[in-house]
Amino acid sequence: MADKHKIIRDSIHGDIKLEGLFLDLLETPEIQRLYNIKQLGLAHLVFPGAHHTRLEHSLGTYHMASQAVEQLNLDNHERQMVSCAALLHDIGHGPFSHTLESILRNLLDVDHVDLTEKLIFGKYEIFDAIEKEIIKSPSVDEILDNHSIDKKKITEIIRGKTHDKPYLSQLLNSAIDVDQLDYLIRDAYYTGVAYGMIDVERFLQTLTINENNLMIKRKGVGVVENILMARGLMYSSVYFHKTVRIAELMLSKALEITPDVDPFQFFKMTDAELINELKTMGPFQHEIATRLKYRKLFKQAYWASSSNLDEARLTVVKNLENKKHHREKEREIENALNIPAGRVIIDVPYQEIHQAEPRIDQTDIMIVDKEEIKSLDDYTPIAGAIRSRAVPDWIIMIVTDERFRDDVSKKAEKILFS
């Protein structure tokens, strides 16, 4: 009898084949839930095609990881570990992907990677008792046990902490890895921007392992430059598009000011479930859900880049990274201008960006040139330019309900920096 397998037709990579362990994992509720979580959160409000899901990205990352381990001629055990980590690396994402992660981090000091690890070890469930009774499917941790998979090694690869063999985790978590490659190409395709044209085949051909680390052959410098440029442009043009950011801030604020919110509970939800739940949480939360449904977003009332501010004001902005102080300043502006709670939102994005995606300005890529190992900086100025480029353009932004925009525009700066 032929081996049981499934072929999934992917918009980016074509046919993706899953069998054995990977087919079993695909059928778990943790993976299937990702069908209902958009890869780019609320970006579809600006880029109407951006309705692709975390599941598509997880499959794409698995596919590229499988290609990479084959090209590198890793042994069967290593291939299985890397491919498994690639398929599972995003199962801990909550609704709207990264949009709400700062709330989870602020309330519980955990992120989606921590939740991914909990799911892998069976310490956290994403379904309730009724759902569990209906679906009756093995969970990720049960499938891993059935196949005698080393869960600790899987989580080390996902976290980038395989210290004995760094190249294993570097395939999934480094300055350039298959996770980033898939989401850059996929997100560019679905948003319609022209920044994700990356020669994947060429990139894979230039991968090599040297001194137990993943490196790039000299002939791959050009494609690495292309990837770094695509990453920078995607962050400024898509991931931190101002209007997308405003929508994300509104959703986060609706949950942030909900009394007695249980972040673990809402992180189990899908996108649609969360929006429906918002409508039951109170008048403000219902309003935000309705505004997001009909794209009636708050407006920018104040904006500044780092070059617009002197040292004293930069210090004020830096202090706003403290969440308690941040909320107090929002309330101060609302009280001074007689604005209802929740309708003034201050965005200080730098810290949040680097917590959500610490690789954003990583360029520590080593190049193998004949018998020498050199830094990417030795071959191109692009690496330095990426590190020095600010993403997004603003260091601080204040958004508000359009009814209060003029008042906030006129007076917020004085209140903020007084």
Description of each model-found segment:
Residues 1-81, 91-418:
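Histidine-centered, transition-metal-coordinating active-site segments
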